[in-house]
């Protein structure tokens, strides 16, 4: 018995594939982590079928490779995501994501009185994980927020 399978999102020859992003989070990751700040082709799949979770998002960035630090920052919002390095249409490296200790110059502090809104400083958060809950503590105002609150703080 043979079956024909068709990729729903075109394969890339060289670059990074971020797979198993929770549905509805892909666009936010593109924006937060400035993944579109490139002139390389980016392919996005939204609400794709997933055996693991029902639905998922997918991002493919040609000729661009995420560092381990960049990939780990994604873990906060896509903890089960996989980040694959592709060379000549083959996966040559899989990055295992883990929460970073800090996230700098990516997120916005939800505290409207925080100096990071009015001063020329990059945001900086300490990442804390306790009992499966992730929170972020702002370096400047020292307030602690649930990671989803910070995700929606734009």
From Swiss-Prot:
Record bears the keyword Zinc: yes
Biological process, per Gene Ontology: 'de novo' pyrimidine nucleobase biosynthetic process; pyrimidine nucleotide biosynthetic process
Cofactor annotation: Zn(2+)
GO molecular function list: metal ion binding
Record-level GO cellular component terms: aspartate carbamoyltransferase complex
Pfam families named among the record's database cross-references: PyrI (PF01948), PyrI_C (PF02748)
UniProt-annotated binding residues for Zn(2+): 109, 114, 138, 141
Co-factor: note: Binds 1 zinc ion per subunit.
Keywords: Metal-binding, Pyrimidine biosynthesis, Zinc
Quaternary structure and interacting proteins, as annotated: Contains catalytic and regulatory chains.
Similarity field: Belongs to the PyrI family.
HAMAP family: Asp_carb_tr_reg
Function: Involved in allosteric regulation of aspartate carbamoyltransferase.
Identification of the protein by name: Aspartate carbamoyltransferase regulatory chain
Species of provenance: Yersinia pestis
């Amino acid at each position: 018995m043979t079956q024909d399978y068709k990729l729903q999102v075109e394969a890339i020859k060289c670059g990074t594939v971020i797979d198993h992003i929770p549905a509805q989070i892909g666009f936010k990751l593109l924006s937060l982590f400035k993944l579109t700040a490139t002139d390389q082709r980016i392919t996005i799949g939204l609400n794709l079928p997933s055996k693991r979770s029902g639905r998922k998002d997918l991002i493919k960035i040609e000729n661009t490779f995420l560092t381990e630090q960049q990939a780990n920052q994604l873990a906060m919002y896509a903890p089960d995501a996989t980040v694959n390095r592709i060379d000549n249409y083959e996966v040559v490296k899989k990055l295992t994501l883990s929460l970073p200790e800090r996230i700098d110059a990516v997120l916005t502090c939800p505290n409207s009185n925080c100096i990071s809104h009015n001063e020329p400083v990059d945001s900086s958060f300490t990442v804390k994980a306790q009992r499966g809950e992730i929170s972020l503590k702002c370096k400047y105002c020292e307030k602690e927020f649930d990671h989803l609150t910070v995700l929606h703080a734009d």
